[in-house]
């Protein structure tokens, strides 16, 4: 089994604390509201949102995937970090055992922030994972970030 790493940084005009609160802590409710074409629902199957929680995420009709199950590994409200593992779903296909994601939101000059995502794709057997296959996760994260950002800019009193 090989592990393939992929890292991406996406800038945002939203301050780090506000982005973490909306995109991460309340993302289960906010993202289906602002990007229903991407994600229609997030349901806690087990747990209360903290480490060990299992979530079932249903993708929108336009997606090539139907669902994933994720396990929350860590939530750090002080350092704005969140890590989770995709443990089930058609997104894993026959090549992947799991995908581990670590998100960190850091302050950027000028009052905005940077969303840093580090992903580890754990392949089954001798399967190779190429950059093109990993790029889908980056594109999805960026689309969701932009949808949340647009919402926050239009609703300046929320998530402060």
From Swiss-Prot:
Q: Which UniProt keywords apply?
A: Allergen, Pathogenesis-related protein, Plant defense
| Listed result of changing residue 15 to S | In clone COR A 1/16
Output the CDD domains linked to this UniProt entry: Bet_v1-like
What Gene3D superfamilies does this protein map onto?
3.30.530.20
Give the superkingdom in one word. Answer: Eukaryota
Entry keyword Transcription regulation: no
The effect annotated for residue 101 to S is: In clone COR A 1/6 and 1/16
Q: Which GO terms describe its cellular component?
A: cytoplasm; nucleus
Provide the family line: Belongs to the BetVI family.
Query: Any other comment in the entry?
Result: The sequence shown is that of clone Cor a I/5.
Q: What name does this protein carry? A: Major pollen allergen Cor a 1 isoforms 5, 6, 11 and 16
Q: Which organism is it from?
A: Corylus avellana (European hazel)
């Amino acid at each position: 089994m090989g592990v393939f790493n992929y890292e991406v940084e996406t800038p945002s005009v939203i301050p780090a604390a506000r982005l973490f609160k909306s995109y991460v802590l309340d993302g289960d409710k906010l993202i289906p509201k602002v990007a229903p074409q991407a994600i229609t629902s997030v349901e806690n199957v087990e747990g209360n949102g903290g480490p060990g929680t299992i979530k079932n995420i249903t993708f929108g009709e336009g997606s090539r995937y139907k669902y994933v199950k994720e396990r929350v590994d860590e939530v750090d409200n002080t350092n704005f970090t969140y890590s989770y593992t995709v443990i089930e779903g058609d997104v894993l296909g026959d090549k992947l055992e799991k995908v581990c994601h670590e998100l960190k939101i850091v302050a950027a000059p000028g009052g905005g922030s940077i969303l840093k995502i580090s992903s580890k794709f754990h392949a089954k057997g001798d399967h190779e994972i190429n950059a093109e296959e990993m790029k889908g996760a980056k594109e999805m994260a960026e689309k969701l970030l932009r949808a949340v950002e647009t919402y926050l800019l239009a609703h300046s009193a929320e998530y402060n």
